[in-house]
């Protein structure tokens, strides 16, 4: 069998990203792996203990606060600290990430279903602002979506996989995270528990 080139092998495991920012992606990914335990207090648990949502991790500790500009011009800044009192679904995405785009309709549907009870916030990083804005418009996402230009918030949350969804309790403490694409049913399972606890 012919040997694959280095570029072909890399493309099998890494989504295509904008060329100017690929080097930064590699740096924060390594740093995120090193910080995954310390940054957000990740504790791996079995799926059974988390309502059988595949790929979820239980989290401990307080969510790191941030204030970032919204991807869309003219909107107020996105400040996590101001969202306490209700659970928060924090979704990390990028315009070049296919699974991120596929899950957006489910996230939007759930944001409408739980309106007034749960906050939904997107965070785009390692991305171009214009491209991220276009994706939000194309997929009909209306909840706040922050622009993380230096990937600082992604590093704080030790994001290793795109997309990643972090669930935060009404008290501002981390609860769970889902690495990779999430479905509407999986969102309901976790969010219902958050709402019951708040």
Residue ranges, per PLM feature:
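N-terminal targeting signals for export/organelle localization
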Residues: 1-69, 198
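Hydrophobic beta-strand anchors of alpha/beta hydrolase catalytic cores
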Residues: 89-90, 120, 165
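Short pre-active-site segment immediately N-terminal to redox-active cysteine/selenocysteine motifs
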Residues: 86-88, 93-96, 161
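Conserved hydrophobic/aromatic "anchor" residues
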Residues: 66, 78, 92-93, 135, ...
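Thiol-based oxidoreductase modules, predominantly thioredoxin-like and allied folds used
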Residues: 116-131, 141-151
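Conserved redox-active cysteine motifs that mediate thiol-disulfide chemistry
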Residues: 92-112
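Thiol/disulfide oxidoreductase modules built on the thioredoxin-like
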Residues: 134-141, 148-198
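A short beta-strand-turn-helix
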Residues: 58-60, 65-88
């Amino acid at each position: 069998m012919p040997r694959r080139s280095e570029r072909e092998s890399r493309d099998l495991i890494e989504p295509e990203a904008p060329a100017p920012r690929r080097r930064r992606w590699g740096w924060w990914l390594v740093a995120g792996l090193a910080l995954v335990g310390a940054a957000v207090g990740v504790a791996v648990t079995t799926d059974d203990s988390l309502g059988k949502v595949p790929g979820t991790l239980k989290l401990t500790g307080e969510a790191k606060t941030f204030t970032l500009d919204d991807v869309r011009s003219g909107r107020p800044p996105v400040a996590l600290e101001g969202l306490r009192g209700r659970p928060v679904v924090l979704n990390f995405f990028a315009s070049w990430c296919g699974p991120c785009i596929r899950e957006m309709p489910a996230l939007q549907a759930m944001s409408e279903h739980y309106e007034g009870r749960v906050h939904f916030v997107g965070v785009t990083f390692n991305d171009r602002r214009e491209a991220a804005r276009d994706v939000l418009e194309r997929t009909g996402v209306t909840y706040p979506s922050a622009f993380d230009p230096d990937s600082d918030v992604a590093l704080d949350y030790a994001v290793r996989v795109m997309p990643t969804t972090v669930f935060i309790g009404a008290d501002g403490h981390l609860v769970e995270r889902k690495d990779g694409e999430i479905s509407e049913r999986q969102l309901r399972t976790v969010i219902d528990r958050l709402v019951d606890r708040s």
